[in-house]
Amino acid sequence: MAATRLMPTEEGQDLIDLTREICDKELRPKVDDAERAAATDESFPTEVFRTLGAAGLLSLPHPEEFGGYGQPYEVYLQVVEEIASAWMSVAVGVSVQSRAAYPVTTFGTPEQQSTLLPDMLSGEQLGAYCLSEQQAGSDIGSMTTRATTDDASGEYVLRGRKAWISHAGHADYYTTFARTSDDGGKGLSCLIVPGDATGLSFGTPERKMGLHCDTVREVVYDDVRVDASRRIGAQGQGMAIALSALDA
């Protein structure tokens, strides 16, 4: 029996109805086979995310001027709950996708927003949120992944590793936080790393009891070059961006 939802707007109820329809037609018929396959062959439900993106369900909390739905979080979170009732791995992925795009919608320049957000919010590009490291989980100020500037090209050069990253190896872009100076928490910056960047690689998927379609791996940056235009916010603003995204 479906939960009775108290929604703040009529549009919110329409979104719940749409979500339930998609869950019944697209998610529930696929979940068991997909989870079973992903436990052994690292398959990933990319097309499911494209379906959700085409329906607008990957952009609910993002502003309308960027292609989002501009919905309050009490609507967005109830939509995620509905998805979780059908396929928990996909619900986790919806949350990851929203968080990966959040720095661009909130801290990006107008040019970055117009260039990056259409594919991010439509589901054409899947994102990963790369913050945690083996020695820097809750204390992100102790991260060691570093981005240095190549004076000749102006590019950032990334070296280091991120741990426990959902969508690693399947994402089209990696919202990455790295150290750009040794000034503690004030020395972090945020970069959008293309998924096909040279030097980007991934560890073996974590073995889990469930949520097999939520692929979790280490992300390795081996002299990965990132154009300076893909830095989000000011240099040194990474801590504020990361904490804001986690609060959102």
For each of these PLM feature ranges, what is it?
Residues T19-L27, G108-T115, G154-R159, C190-L200, ...:
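Long, well-ordered alpha-helical segments
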Residues V92-E111, G137-I140, T149:
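N-terminal glycine-rich flavin-associated loop
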Residues Q135-S138, W164-H167, T180-D182, K208-T215:
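Short Gly/Pro-enriched turn/cap motifs at secondary-structure boundaries
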